[in-house]
A protein has these predicted regions:
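Flexible, processing/modification-adjacent segments and terminal tails
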Residues: 11-20, 80-153, 226
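Short, exposed beta-strand/loop patches in secreted or surface proteins that constitute
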Residues: 27-29, 51-56, 73-75, 126-135, ...
Length: 227
């Protein structure tokens, strides 16, 4: 394990390179315009409820919870965090932090890396300070903005193997974690689990059980060839 980390530290990509490769992940979604992620939401100690996360690309996210008011975030490439609507609380904070990093498909390719950078900067992460290496849920991740063992500073984590956003710690200590990428339940591209931690406690957790609307690039090429 020490040898592995030593090899990783020998080459750590620049922030520009990391944002570029993360932005390029969106190609796998092809011409997908909307996605619905259905699952369950748990907030603090309340019982979990059925919920749907509706994504309209780019940068529009809406969370509908059984028995509750919907919450939404609408952003732009210049302001990825966007404007939030709905009752404040952990669920809305989770949506605000996650939306720029899961709904950037549809931003022009030349602008997408900068939109990701702006979202990280808005959270307070000093992405120009260089990168480090750490682990999250048994996966290696690059850490932008602070030392990986310093959770008091804003920082963005990006999984090394899949170039996907992994964790965002914002000013004030809100800690978003995007876990379990690569599962069919979340169409492989999205995280299956979204968690928001505050003060060392789990404040909100959305778990995806089914994804609808994803049209991958390979699927579209096959359909186009049949026409």
């Amino acid at each position: 394990m020490r040898l592995l980390f030593a090899l990783l530290l020998a080459y750590i990509p620049s922030a520009d390179s990391l944002f570029k490769h993360t932005a390029q992940r969106a190609r796998a979604l092809g011409r997908t315009r909307e996605v619905t992620l259905s699952g369950t939401l748990a907030v603090n100690d309340e019982p979990q409820r059925n919920a749907q996360l509706l994504l309209r690309f780019p940068l529009q996210c809406r969370l509908e919870v059984e028995g509750g008011q919907p919450i939404s975030v609408k952003g732009t490439a210049q302001n990825p965090e966007g404007v939030a609507e709905g009752p404040s609380g952990p669920a809305l904070r989770l949506l605000q932090m996650a939306c720029p990093f899961i709904a950037y498909r549809g931003i022009p390719a030349a602008d997408a890396p900068q939109a990701l950078r702006v979202a990280a900067l808005a959270a307070g992460a000093n992405v120009g300070a260089g990168a480090a290496v750490s682990r999250l849920a048994d996966r290696v991740a690059y850490v932008l903005g602070a030392a990986p063992r310093d959770p008091s500073s804003p920082q963005l984590w990006i999984y090394k193997d899949i170039n996907a956003p992994a964790r965002l710690i914002a000013q004030g200590g809100a800690d978003l974690r995007l876990l379990q990428y690569g599962t069919p339940a979340a169409a492989d591209w999205f995280p299956r689990v979204f968690e928001l931690w505050t003060g060392g406690r789990l404040a909100a957790r959305f778990e995806v059980l089914e994804a609808k609307g994803v049209r991958g690039g390979a699927q579209e090429e096959e359909e186009d060839s049949e026409e």
